[in-house]
Amino acid sequence: MKYTLTRANPDADTYPAQTRQTVNNPIEDEVNRNVFMGKLEDMVHASANWGRKNSLWPFNFGTSCCYVEYATTLTAVHDLSRFGAEVIRASPRQADVMIVAGTCFVKMAPVIQRLYEQMLEPKWVISMGSCANSGGMYDIYSVVQGVDKIIPVDVYVPGCPPRPEALIQGLMLLQESITKERRPLGAYVNDKGIYQPQMLPERDRKQADRIAVKNLRSPDSI
């Protein structure tokens, strides 16, 4: 059997030298991939946000024709349940995301505000359609020029009306935003020990203001 010696070619296509990666300590690399290295607080926030983004309960609230497209996302064609948001709630006290689908009239504004206040924390709002975003083509006295003038909005979905795919994309953007949030939990551990923020419900927090009211506002005012 004869052998021949050839000089190594670094530019060869077979086993190119420039793509080889060396591992200094394979045990350390294996540990970093399988063992969590970080703060317990970060892990708790990540776990809580993961559960929140995959269990969004929308509030069944439609004000105009955009609600037809919103309802289409619940059908088998689009299947909103893939994103954990198929549990539609009829009560704001059981929902954590309000999807304002359609035109917001001046007479609806106090109702939307009150329903938003009744939602439990943490809560989010998706503005769906041009009318909910900026009033749309209704630049008149009876239409609120954007639902963000009465309640805070997290995600805007453009369109007149937007397609169901656009709403699903907006929901995915909201889930991505929830993943990066650091909202206060019920109780967690910090450098000073166990900390539990005092988060009063809206009913108790605004009880003194309601008692002090002498003249009730008109239902068609903002």
UniProtKB/Swiss-Prot annotation:
<dbReference type="GO" id="GO:0048038">
    <property type="term" value="F:quinone binding"/>
</dbReference>
<dbReference type="GO" id="GO:0051539">
    <property type="term" value="F:4 iron, 4 sulfur cluster binding"/>
</dbReference>
<dbReference type="GO" id="GO:0045271">
    <property type="term" value="C:respiratory chain complex I"/>
</dbReference>
<keyword id="KW-0874">Quinone</keyword>
<keyword id="KW-0479">Metal-binding</keyword>
<keyword id="KW-0997">Cell inner membrane</keyword>
<dbReference type="Pfam" id="PF01058">
    <property type="entry name" value="Oxidored_q6"/>
</dbReference>
<feature type="binding site">
    <location>
        <position position="160"/>
    </location>
    <ligand>
        <name>[4Fe-4S] cluster</name>
    </ligand>
</feature>
<keyword id="KW-0830">Ubiquinone</keyword>
<dbReference type="GO" id="GO:0009060">
    <property type="term" value="P:aerobic respiration"/>
</dbReference>
<feature type="binding site">
    <location>
        <position position="65"/>
    </location>
    <ligand>
        <name>[4Fe-4S] cluster</name>
    </ligand>
</feature>
<dbReference type="GO" id="GO:0005506">
    <property type="term" value="F:iron ion binding"/>
</dbReference>
<dbReference type="InterPro" id="IPR006138">
    <property type="entry name" value="NADH_UQ_OxRdtase_20Kd_su"/>
</dbReference>
<comment type="similarity">
    <text>Belongs to the complex I 20 kDa subunit family.</text>
</comment>
<keyword id="KW-0411">Iron-sulfur</keyword>
<protein>
    <recommendedName>
        <fullName>NADH-quinone oxidoreductase subunit B</fullName>
        <ecNumber>7.1.1.-</ecNumber>
    </recommendedName>
</protein>
<keyword id="KW-0520">NAD</keyword>
<keyword id="KW-1278">Translocase</keyword>
<dbReference type="GO" id="GO:0005886">
    <property type="term" value="C:plasma membrane"/>
</dbReference>
<keyword id="KW-0813">Transport</keyword>
<feature type="binding site">
    <location>
        <position position="131"/>
    </location>
    <ligand>
        <name>[4Fe-4S] cluster</name>
    </ligand>
</feature>
<dbReference type="GO" id="GO:0008137">
    <property type="term" value="F:NADH dehydrogenase (ubiquinone) activity"/>
</dbReference>
<comment type="function">
    <text>NDH-1 shuttles electrons from NADH, via FMN and iron-sulfur (Fe-S) centers, to quinones in the respiratory chain. The immediate electron acceptor for the enzyme in this species is believed to be ubiquinone. Couples the redox reaction to proton translocation (for every two electrons transferred, four hydrogen ions are translocated across the cytoplasmic membrane), and thus conserves the redox energy in a proton gradient.</text>
</comment>
<comment type="subunit">
    <text>NDH-1 is composed of 14 different subunits. Subunits NuoB, C, D, E, F, and G constitute the peripheral sector of the complex.</text>
</comment>
<dbReference type="GO" id="GO:0015990">
    <property type="term" value="P:electron transport coupled proton transport"/>
</dbReference>
<keyword id="KW-1003">Cell membrane</keyword>
<keyword id="KW-0408">Iron</keyword>
<dbReference type="GO" id="GO:0050136">
    <property type="term" value="F:NADH:ubiquinone reductase (non-electrogenic) activity"/>
</dbReference>
<keyword id="KW-0004">4Fe-4S</keyword>
<feature type="binding site">
    <location>
        <position position="66"/>
    </location>
    <ligand>
        <name>[4Fe-4S] cluster</name>
    </ligand>
</feature>
<keyword id="KW-0472">Membrane</keyword>
<dbReference type="InterPro" id="IPR006137">
    <property type="entry name" value="NADH_UbQ_OxRdtase-like_20kDa"/>
</dbReference>
